[in-house]
């Protein structure tokens, strides 16, 4: 979603919210939480407060009038009723007869509410230096996590990874084979952004950065000589990330055409640009998602940018057998998240043995 559209939607939701949610928003913006995260949280609060009004828990006329005392006095039974409402209510999508939202969606809603309650009961300070209230009902609410072993998850993911020669094979396909399948009109459109598209995909495959980290890169964040990029990780932490050498020619080719192709000025600091009505703008995450989906589906299997992150992590673990190194590369504080890649690599080794 383009940043301008995202901010517009955030503003519309903020206009609906009670004063204490607006304080929460401002506080998390200072952390900083990303605008995307805050937008998703505001949507969850809109869903929750709408239910509060519909269920009669508050007799306020509108969401912005719901007093803080409603949250303070919310019972565990009330929260469980809300969860049941989410699980059993008819979906808004008229094309399905499925009842309720998924457990993943419910967990996301509860996570957003837990964050708000933690702020109100622990983090915020009133005039006396105390939180607004102390009773946190969310600590009494249990969530059900999706049960899946690492082995099962590895099996599901590995078919969507570009391992071994497929990493550079994917880039070569986009560069040389994909254009041959296009009509003259489609080829003209492809050539306008070919260098940029290849540079973005090469960077994702060579660094393992998150999509948000890649699209938020500025020109100054790329050190092509050292093959290092400076990114803003989750929670606003800055980090320097090494980039594999195979991405260098793709980045060089893009930088060679960036200024002229995208009509840049000194104020255009974003590394990856798109041209809209002759004006350069930072490329947005949804555009990259669509681009990766299109090229990957034509090459092998439709994947997301996050699967390119998994690809880099798996290849790096296969080469080093070091979960610590992989954790550092991905920006994780713990090696627990990288356990997945040991299972994927073990399966790959077994397949190699079976072929002997």
Swiss-Prot record:
Residue span(s) of domain Tyr recombinase: 169-354
Activity regulation note: FtsK is required for recombination.
HAMAP family per record: Recomb_XerS
Protein name: Tyrosine recombinase XerS
Catalytic residue list: 210, 234, 306, 309, 332, 341 (o-(3'-phospho-dna)-tyrosine intermediate)
CC per GO annotation: cytoplasm
Family indicated by similarity: Belongs to the 'phage' integrase family. XerS subfamily.
Localisation: Cytoplasm
Residue intervals of the Core-binding (CB) domain: 16-121
Alphabetical keyword list: Cell cycle, Cell division, Chromosome partition, Cytoplasm, DNA integration, DNA recombination, DNA-binding
Statement: the UniProt record of this protein carries the keyword ATP-binding: no
Predominant localisation class: cytoplasm
One Gene Ontology biological process: cell division
Gene Ontology molecular functions: DNA binding; tyrosine-based site-specific recombinase activity
A Pfam family recorded for this sequence: Phage_int_SAM_1
Keyword Nucleotidyltransferase (UniProt): no
InterPro entries noted in UniProt: CB, DNA_brk_join_enz, Integrase-like_cat_sf, Integrase_catalytic, Integrase_recombinase_N, Integrase_SAM-like_N, Recomb_XerS, Tyrosine_recombinase_XerCD
Record's function text: Site-specific tyrosine recombinase, which acts by catalyzing the cutting and rejoining of the recombining DNA molecules. Essential to convert dimers of the bacterial chromosome into monomers to permit their segregation at cell division.
